[in-house]
Amino acid sequence: MIGMILTAIISTTLIMALLVAAGVFTWVERRLLAFVQERLGPNRVGPFGFLQWVADTVKIIAKEDEIPPGADRVAYRLAPAVAATPVLAGFGVVAFGENLALAEIDVGVMFLLGMMGLTAYAVVLGALASPSRFSLIGGLRAAAQMLAYEAFLGLSMLGVVMIAGSLSMSEIVRAQENVWFIVLQPIGAALFTLGGIAAAHRTPFDLPESENDLVGGYITEYTGMSFGLFFLGEYLAILLVSAFAVTLFFGGWLGPWLPGPIWFGLKTGVIAAMFVWIRAALPRPRYDQMVTMAWKVALPLALANVLITGFIVVARSAP
């Protein structure tokens, strides 16, 4: 009984911390984008505009949340929750430090990959539930994008799994005590970055919402907190992908002098900032270009990386 209560308290604390982290990251993103574009960015609410995310949250909560005529009411309401819930569940197996994970499971990598994939279903569900044609096109793009990136995203981390000899998040981190896997798996890290951006539906792979040609894509008809939940899921997905990348390629909590959780947080912040830099620097490709790159470039590279890594691992383990 006490163990269940303690687990509930820790889980609630983690969820609240993640919600605050997602809000703070929106401020960080806007400030970094402003710096890249040589403008000020948010600077009115709080010091350096730090409390802007609080004001935006209050504004979204206060807005009316309507269901447009012709929408599937059940699916329309369910989609925003599906966007955020799997990402929060994914953080449950992330190892923030030595013996510091909400749930230590032997197949943590597979669980995280599955949770990341579920976010695409929220996009498709919201698009199909909406009466807008723009939403439908955005949902179709999301489905095709999911099929394209999931294939090489899973293969990109397979080399790390073979070297570490485990699917456990903690064991993968411990296997990097001598050298980070970014050194041994640079191709896998690059492919994981591409797939992670696509999984989070971030620029330049935000084609399901693509404001230039689809108005707002799958979220065209959403307002109020339903709209906010989609964006909460997106920003949480960025943080989850960053934490996943740190675990797989950058040594997780390992580092000198500072405590492990601090190292993990710093590394995750740097990777998340890199995603913002990519958004500021790269244009959005055409939809057909993105799909072509995934199937004809990224997937063959991922397969080649797996084959080469497998040969090396077998050769090193041979007597």
Curated annotation (Swiss-Prot):
Signal peptide: none annotated. It is a multi-pass membrane protein. This is NADH-quinone oxidoreductase subunit H 1. It is found in: Cell inner membrane. It catalyses: a quinone + NADH + 5 H(+)(in) = a quinol + NAD(+) + 4 H(+)(out). GO terms for molecular function: NADH dehydrogenase activity; oxidoreductase activity, acting on NAD(P)H, quinone or similar compound as acceptor; quinone binding. Belongs to the complex I subunit 1 family. It comes from the Bacteria. The gene is nuoH1. NDH-1 shuttles electrons from NADH, via FMN and iron-sulfur (Fe-S) centers, to quinones in the respiratory chain. The immediate electron acceptor for the enzyme in this species is believed to be ubiquinone. Couples the redox reaction to proton translocation (for every two electrons transferred, four hydrogen ions are translocated across the cytoplasmic membrane), and thus conserves the redox energy in a proton gradient. This subunit may bind ubiquinone. Coiled coil: none annotated. It holds the Pfam family NADHdh. NDH-1 is composed of 14 different subunits. Subunits NuoA, H, J, K, L, M, N constitute the membrane sector of the complex. Keywords: Cell inner membrane, Cell membrane, Membrane, NAD, Quinone, Translocase, Transmembrane, Transmembrane helix, Ubiquinone. It comes from Rhodopseudomonas palustris (strain BisA53). Its EC number is 7.1.1.-. One of its GO terms (biological process) is aerobic respiration. The chain crosses the membrane at residues 5-25, 78-98, 109-129, 147-167, 179-199, 214-234, 238-258, 262-282, 294-314. One of its GO terms (cellular component) is plasma membrane.
